[in-house]
Amino acid sequence: MEVQVAPLRSWEDFFPGSDRFGRPDFKDISKWNNRVVNNLLYYQTNYLMVAAAVVAIVGFLSPLNMLIGGTVVILVFLGFVWVSHNKDILRRMKKQYPTTFVIVIMLSSYFLISYLGDVMVFMFGITLPLLLMFIHASLRLRNIKNKLENKKEEIGLKKTPMGIILDALEQQEDNINKLASYIPKVKE
């Protein structure tokens, strides 16, 4: 299947009035996780633009440090993904504790970059866009169009770059399994 880039959502859709934002239910982690994953899929191009703007600003201010910091984070992330696919314990940790997995990647990157003296570039250049994405994805309530687009991605009618990343982090398999177990129930 061909990978499709998700369309850039309008500013009114991406950042509407305060009535389309709501505090997540911290007691129901799976519901909160579902909101974050679905918003990451739906607004992925907008998030890419925000990240590119922040990275460009920081990169302009400190290009060498930004390059070193970005390289280290990518290498650490690829290393963890490779190790987790080859080691059962890490794979289970990634599946059961995805937030912990990402925090371990960030902390590992922090320590590697601190040896190079580029901690501030890492913190502002790479972590700030991730934090902004997470905050928006956590607070933004979904709409009908969002839910429809996410269903297309879940059942495999389309594939997007964020969908590939979430698959690598094993965040979409549960949704597909839920859908697969729901279809026979509907037929009955």
Swiss-Prot record:
TM spans (from-to): 36-56, 57-77, 94-114, 115-135
Ranges per topology, Cytoplasmic: 1-35, 78-93, 136-188
UniProt xrefs under InterPro entries: Prenylated_rab_accept_PRA1
One annotated GO biological process: learning or memory
Known partners and oligomeric status: Binds to prenylated RAB and Ras superfamily members.
Annotated keywords: Acetylation, Cell membrane, Cytoplasm, Cytoskeleton, Endoplasmic reticulum, Membrane, Transmembrane, Transmembrane helix
Subcellular localization, as worded in the UniProt entry: Endoplasmic reticulum membrane; Cell membrane; Cytoplasm; Cytoplasm, Cytoskeleton
Main subcellular location: endoplasmic reticulum
Keyword Endoplasmic reticulum: yes
Modified residues (N-acetylmethionine): 1
Record's bilayer topology term: Multi-pass membrane protein
Name of protein: PRA1 family protein 3
Function recorded in the entry: Regulates intracellular concentrations of taurine and glutamate. Negatively modulates SLC1A1/EAAC1 glutamate transport activity by decreasing its affinity for glutamate in a PKC activity-dependent manner. May be involved in membrane traffic.
Record region (Targeting to endoplasmic reticulum membrane): 136-188
Any Gene Ontology CC annotation: plasma membrane
Record family assignment: Belongs to the PRA1 family.
